[in-house]
UniProtKB/Swiss-Prot annotation:
NCBIfam families: topA_bact. Pfam families: Topoisom_bac, Toprim, Zn_ribbon_Top1. It comes from Staphylococcus saprophyticus subsp. saprophyticus (strain ATCC 15305 / DSM 20229 / NCIMB 8711 / NCTC 7292 / S-41). The record marks 33, 139-140, 143, 148, 155, 300, 487 as: Interaction with DNA. GO terms for cellular component: chromosome. Releases the supercoiling and torsional tension of DNA, which is introduced during the DNA replication and transcription, by transiently cleaving and rejoining one strand of the DNA duplex. Introduces a single-strand break via transesterification at a target site in duplex DNA. The scissile phosphodiester is attacked by the catalytic tyrosine of the enzyme, resulting in the formation of a DNA-(5'-phosphotyrosyl)-enzyme intermediate and the expulsion of a 3'-OH DNA strand. The free DNA strand then undergoes passage around the unbroken strand, thus removing DNA supercoils. Mg(2+) binds at residues 9, 82. Monomer. This is DNA topoisomerase 1. Belongs to the type IA topoisomerase family. Keywords: DNA-binding, Isomerase, Magnesium, Metal-binding, Repeat, Topoisomerase, Zinc, Zinc-finger. Signal peptide: none annotated. Its EC number is 5.6.2.1.
C-alpha cells in the first residue's frame, strides 16, 4: 500500500505524476475545486467582515469522500495543485476538508510535468502561502458581490438571465466603445501617387514624398493635379541613397496572452480552444516507450522568464541544428508578475514537433509546434536586414523607394511573429545604383482613398487590449470573452465582435448606475490591489470593504431609480402552425430560434433555417440549408431531413462537375476559396 497521498486537479495530471513517483505514492484527482460559494445565494456575509460561506460543490460529495478515505490511510498528504493563486486556493480548501495542520509543509509546486521537475518538487515541499489564497478569495468574493448584486437588478428591470461582472462588463465596454467610434467616424478624402520605375532591367516602385523639399498633403484631386502637371517627361534623378543595416530581434517566448493572440492569428483557434489544448499538453501526453510526459510548461503565466537549464538546452540544439552563427549571445531577461513562473515553452527542446507528431492530435500538434518554434526562435540570433531608401527627384517633386533584403536570416529561419510579416518595402527589390544616375518612370498612378474607421475587435486584438490595459489576469481572458458571447451581448461576425442590441442596453444601464464597474482605471487599480494582497502588503478584507461601501449605495440607487426596459422580441415573419399566433425570434444556448409569441399557452418552437438558393443534389426536391453544429461549426443539409440525409461541410454552389457530374462545392482555406468537385479531382481557379 502507498505511504503517501498526492492530490492534483485532473486525472490526466494524476496519471502522469504517479508514473514518476513510484509505488510509495498514490496520486488522485480532486477534479478541480471541491469547495466554492453557494450558487443559490450570495454566500458572503457583508455584515460579518465579509466572511465567505464555503460549501462542497454539488456533485463533489463522492470525490470528497474518496479523498478523505485515502488521506486517513496515508502517512503524508501532498497537495500538488497548479502553481498559481487558483491552485493555492484549491490546496487550501483541500487542507481544510482533510483537516491537515496549517503548519504542515505539504504543498508541492512544479512549473512543468517532467520526471526531474516533479521529483525535485517533492524534495522541497512548503506550507500553503495564505497571501496567494487571500488574493484568490478577494477576487472570488469581489466577483460574487458584483455579480449577485447587479444581476438581480438587471433581471427585474431589463430581462431575466442577464449578468454583469467586474471584468466582463469592461470587456463589453471595449467592444461597444469601438462600435461607437465606427458609427461616429467621418471618412476623409486623401490621395496617393505611386510610380513604377525602371533602371536597366530592374523594375521597382516608389511613392510621392515631398514637393519643394516639404511634405505636401494630397487631400483632393486638385492637389494631385498640382503635382502631376509639374512632371516633365519620364526621367528622374537619384538624389539620395541611404543604406542601413537593421537588426531584428526575435519575439519573447509566449505568455498566456501572446499565445492566445498568435494561436488566433496563425491557427484560427479561439482563446478557449487554445487553453484547452495547452492544458492537455501541460498535463501529459503518452509517448509510448518514453511514458507519459508533460510537453509544455504551465500555461497560465504573465512571465517571459526562462530557466538557465531550458536556455542551455535550446542553445545546444540550435548550435547542432543550425550552427554557431545562429546562437544568441543575449542573456534572457524575461519579466512578469508571477516571478515563480516561466514563459510557456516546451519542457524539452529535444522533443521536436516532428518527433511528437504521431503522439498528438492534429490540433495538439499545431499548438505544440507554435509553442516550440516560438521558444527556440526566441533563443536564436537576430536577423540582419539591409535596408535601402532611394529618393528620386524631378522638378522639385520627390518620390521615395524603400527596399530591404535579408542579409542573415537568424531566428527568421524558424519562426516569424505574425505582425512582423507586413513591412513596407520588403518585396521591393531596388537596383544597385548611385546618386546622380537617372531612372525611368514607366507609370505614375494617382489613386483616391478615404480614411477608414478603426477595425472591430478580433478575439486576438481583444485579448491584447485586455492585457495592455491590465484588465483581468491570464486565466480570465478566455472565459470573459466566452461569457459575453454566451450572454448574447456580442456576436462574432466574420471573426470580429459586434455588440448586440441587448449588449448595448445592458452596458448603458451598468454605465449609468455602476460607473466604477466599467471604468478601466478602476479595474486596473483593483488588479493592483489584488497583487498587493498576494504580496502580503494589504489585507484582503480591507480591499473588499473599501469597494463595497460605495458599491452598496450604487445598488440601492439602481433598485430605486432604474427604469424598466421592455425588449421586444424580433418578429419572425410567419405564424405558428399550431395556434396561428405570430412567431418571434428568441436567443437560446446554441443561437437564435423561432418560438410562438403565445408562450406559455403554446410552446411551439422551430429552428431558423437559412436557405442558400441551391436545390438538394441528392433528393432533388428539398433546398440546401445552412445549419450549425453544437460546436457552432457551419454545415449544409437538406431541408427535407430526416427524409433526406444529405449533409456536407462545404457549401454546394448549384452546379455539377463537368468531369463526373457530381455536385460542386466552395471550399474555403483562410481568406481564399476554391470551387472543387465533391467527388473527383476537378478544381477551378482560386478566388481571393
Amino acid at each position: 500500500m502507498a505511504e503517501n497521498l498526492v492530490i492534483v486537479e485532473s486525472p490526466a495530471k494524476a496519471k502522469t505524476i504517479e508514473k514518476y513517483l513510484g509505488k510509495k505514492y498514490k496520486v488522485i484527482a480532486s477534479m478541480g475545486h471541491v469547495r466554492d460559494l453557494p450558487r443559490s445565494q450570495m454566500g458572503v456575509d457583508a455584515e460579518n467582515d465579509y466572511e465567505p460561506k464555503y460549501i462542497t460543490i454539488r456533485g463533489k460529495g463522492p470525490v470528497v469522500k474518496e479523498l478523505k478515505k485515502h488521506a486517513k490511510k496515508a502517512k503524508k498528504v501532498f497537495l500538488a495543485s497548479d502553481p498559481d493563486r487558483e491552485g493555492e486556493a484549491i490546496a487550501w480548501h483541500l487542507a481544510n476538508i482533510l483537516n491537515l495542520e496549517d503548519s504542515t509543509e505539504n504543498r508541492v509546486v512544479f512549473n512543468e510535468i517532467t520526471k526531474d521537475a516533479v521529483k525535485d518538487s517533492f524534495k522541497h515541499p512548503r506550507g500553503i502561502e495564505m497571501e496567494l489564497v487571500d488574493a484568490q478569495q478577494a477576487r472570488r468574493i469581489l466577483d460574487r458581490l458584483v455579480g449577485y448584486n447587479i444581476s438581480p437588478v438587471l433581471w427585474k428591470k431589463v430581462k431575466k438571465g442577464l449578468s454583469a461582472g467586474r471584468v466582463q462588463s469592461v470587456a463589453l465596454r471595449l467592444v461597444i466603445d469601438r462600435e461607437n467610434e465606427i458609427r461616429n467616424f467621418k471618412p476623409e478624402e486623401y490621395w496617393k501617387i505611386e510610380g513604377e520605375f525602371r533602371y536597366k532591367k530592374t523594375k521597382f516602385t516608389a511613392k510621392f514624398l515631398h514637393f519643394k523639399n516639404k511634405p505636401f498633403k494630397l487631400t483632393e484631386k486638385a492637389d494631385v493635379e498640382k503635382i502631376t502637371t509639374q512632371l516633365d517627361g519620364d526621367q528622374f534623378e537619384v538624389t539620395k541613397v541611404t543604406k542601413k543595416e537593421k537588426t531584428r530581434y526575435p519575439a519573447n517566448p509566449f505568455t498566456t496572452s501572446t499565445l492566445q493572440q498568435e494561436a488566433a492569428r496563425k491557427l484560427n483557434f479561439k482563446a478557449r480552444k487554445t487553453m484547452m489544448l495547452a492544458q492537455q499538453l501541460y498535463e501529459g501526453i503518452d509517448l509510448k516507450k518514453q511514458g507519459t510526459v508533460g510537453l509544455i510548461t504551465y500555461m497560465r503565466t504573465d512571465s517571459t522568464r526562462i530557466s538557465d537549464q531550458a536556455q542551455s538546452e535550446a542553445k545546444n540544439y540550435i548550435q547542432e541544428t543550425y550552427g554557431n552563427d545562429y546562437t544568441s549571445n543575449r542573456k534572457s531577461k524575461g519579466q512578469g508578475d508571477q516571478d515563480a513562473h516561466e514563459a510557456i515553452r516546451p519542457s524539452s527542446t529535444l522533443r521536436t514537433p516532428n518527433e511528437m507528431k504521431n503522439f498528438l492530435t492534429r490540433d495538439q500538434h499545431r499548438l505544440y509546434k507554435l509553442i516550440w518554434e516560438r521558444f527556440v526562435a526566441s533563443q536564436m540570433a537576430p536577423a540582419i536586414l539591409d535596408t535601402v531608401a532611394m529618393d528620386l527627384t524631378q522638378n522639385d517633386i520627390k518620390f521615395r523607394a524603400n527596399g530591404q533584403t535579408i542579409k542573415f536570416k537568424g531566428f527568421m529561419t524558424l519562426y516569424v511573429e505574425t505582425k512582423d510579416d507586413s513591412e513596407d518595402g520588403k518585396d521591393n527589390k531596388l537596383p544597385n545604383i548611385g546618386e546622380g544616375e537617372m531612372v525611368t518612370a514607366t507609370n505614375i498612378e494617382p489613386s483616391q482613398h478615404f480614411t477608414q474607421p478603426p477595425p472591430r475587435y478580433t478575439e486576438a486584438r481583444l485579448v491584447k487590449t485586455m492585457e495592455e490595459l491590465k484588465i483581468g489576469r491570464p486565466s480570465t481572458y478566455a472565459p470573459t470573452i466566452d461569457t459575453i458571447q454566451k450572454r448574447n451581448y456580442v456576436k462574432n461576425e466574420s471573426k470580429r465582435f459586434v455588440p448586440t442590441e441587448l449588449g448595448e442596453i445592458v452596458h448603458e444601464q451598468v454605465k449609468d448606475y455602476f460607473p466604477e464597474i466599467i471604468d478601466v482605471d478602476f479595474t486596473v487599480n483593483m488588479e493592483t490591489l489584488l497583487d498587493k494582497v498576494a504580496d502580503g502588503e494589504i489585507g484582503w478584507k480591507k480591499v473588499i470593504s473599501d469597494f463595497y461601501s460605495s458599491f452598496k449605495q450604487d445598488v440601492e440607487r439602481a433598485e430605486e431609480e432604474m427604469e424598466k426596459i421592455e425588449i421586444k422580441d424580433e418578429p419572425a415573419g410567419e405564424d405558428c402552425e399550431v395556434c396561428g399566433s405570430p412567431m418571434v425570434i428568441k436567443m437560446g444556448r446554441y443561437g437564435k430560434f423561432m418560438a410562438c409569441s403565445n408562450f406559455p399557452d403554446c410552446r411551439n418552437t422551430k429552428a431558423i433555417v437559412k436557405t442558400i438558393g441551391v436545390t438538394c443534389p441528392k433528393c432533388k426536391e428539398g433546398d440546401v440549408v445552412e445549419r450549425k453544429s453544437k460546436k457552432n461549426r457551419i454545415f449544409y443539409g437538406c431541408s427535407k431531413y430526416p427524409e433526406c440525409d444529405f449533409v456536407t461541410w462545404d457549401k454546394p454552389i448549384g452546379r455539377d462537375c463537368p468531369k463526373c457530374e457530381h455536385y460542386l462545392v466552395e471550399k474555403k482555406q483562410g481568406r481564399k476559396s476554391q470551387v472543387v468537385c465533391s467527388n473527383c479531382d476537378y478544381k477551378e481557379e482560386e478566388q481571393k
